[in-house]
């Protein structure tokens, strides 16, 4: 079986991370679809969130994720949801990512068709973000999701936060959904040997693009001439980061690498190590959520390779796994975690 000439990745995030039966039902359309491969199902109990990764031909991916959404909206009730991760809806975010033979503009159209179909069928408020955003304040997902589910009823009533698709009204059981087209994003977390989330967040503030608030001697934020709070930029321009809890005893720096070619996995790992050491902590483990491009692993592998120039991809990947501490929480299976290798495995099977 040959690999399709056009491939789109879709990574829907569902606000359920504990009930395996519900996730099994939600992902069944992917397992049953022709022309779509289920690459990863990442359930997080503390986040109460599951990240599903599928890849396939554009039309089949669109149909399949709509089917998954239909099931999720029937089974997940946001009135009963709690979890560590920021969220605003049962189907929280649905990104479309070009992989092969597809442009970002074509993925924008896929996201718009998804939003139109789902909002029409369920009356679900949907916001377009990233490359699909129709206004500047909706490019960044954290801006759309600010206030989360609990603040959505008030937020959606504001004219400036009227959804792009669907009614401007609060749906208590469903919440709202964000969808859009974006480039490949790497979700990557680094655990620390502390249970103090504030320490993880202080490290996150030093490395993320948005940085931290500038405060005066009394600890009050300083307001600039434009009326906005002044911020001190962090180390990396293409990084989102925050402090979360991996479990009840382990804090972590949770990140989205928006441009892994500019800001690599090894770059953020080493920065976290350095910042952690300054406050008497250690980085203990790395965690990838979803899949990672091969080139990102090879880049990290080159960084952590001690010997002469190495061209063997398998050796470089092993170097990356060790350097990024990806084998500290559980066995890291590169054949199922690296996008290109996972696609090849799916085609061969």
Residue ranges of model-derived segments:
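Long, contiguous binding/interaction regions
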Residues: 2-349
């Amino acid at each position: 079986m040959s690999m399709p000439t056009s491939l789109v990745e879709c990574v829907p995030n569902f606000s359920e991370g504990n009930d395996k039966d519900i996730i099994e039902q939600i992902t069944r359309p992917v397992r049953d679809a022709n022309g779509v491969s289920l690459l990863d199902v990442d359930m997080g109990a503390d986040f109460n969130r599951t990240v599903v990764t599928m890849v396939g031909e554009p039309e089949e991916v669109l149909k399949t994720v709509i089917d998954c959404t239909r099931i999720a909206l029937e089974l997940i009730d946001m009135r009963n949801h709690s979890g560590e991760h920021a969220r605003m809806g049962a189907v929280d975010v649905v990104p479309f990512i070009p992989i092969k033979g597809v442009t970002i503009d074509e993925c924008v159209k896929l996201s718009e068709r998804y939003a139109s179909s789902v909002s029409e069928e369920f009356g679900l408020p949907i916001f377009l973000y990233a490359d699909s955003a129709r206004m500047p304040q909706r490019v960044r997902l954290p801006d759309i999701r600010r206030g989360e589910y609990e603040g959505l009823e008030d937020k959606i009533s504001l004219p400036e936060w009227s959804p792009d698709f669907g009614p401007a009204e609060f749906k208590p059981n469903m919440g709202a959904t964000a969808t859009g087209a974006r480039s490949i994003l790497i979700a990557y977390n680094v655990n620390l040997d502390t249970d103090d989330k504030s320490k993880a967040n202080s490290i996150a503030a030093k490395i993320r693009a948005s940085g931290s608030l500038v405060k005066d001697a009394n600890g009050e934020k300083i307001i600039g001439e434009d009326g906005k709070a002044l911020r001190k930029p962090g180390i990396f321009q293409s990084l989102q980061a925050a402090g979360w809890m991996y479990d009840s005893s382990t804090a972590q720096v949770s990140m989205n690498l928006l441009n892994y070619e500019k800001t690599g996995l090894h770059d953020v790992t080493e920065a976290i190590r350095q910042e952690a050491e300054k406050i008497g902590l250690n980085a203990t483990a790395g965690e990838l959520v979803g899949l990672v491009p091969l080139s990102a692993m090879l880049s990290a592998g080159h960084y952590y390779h001690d010997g002469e120039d190495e061209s063997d991809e398998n050796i470089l990947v092993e170097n990356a796994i060790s350097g990024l501490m990806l084998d500290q929480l559980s066995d890291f299976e590169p054949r199922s975690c690296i996008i290109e290798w996972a696609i090849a495995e799916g085609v061969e099977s």
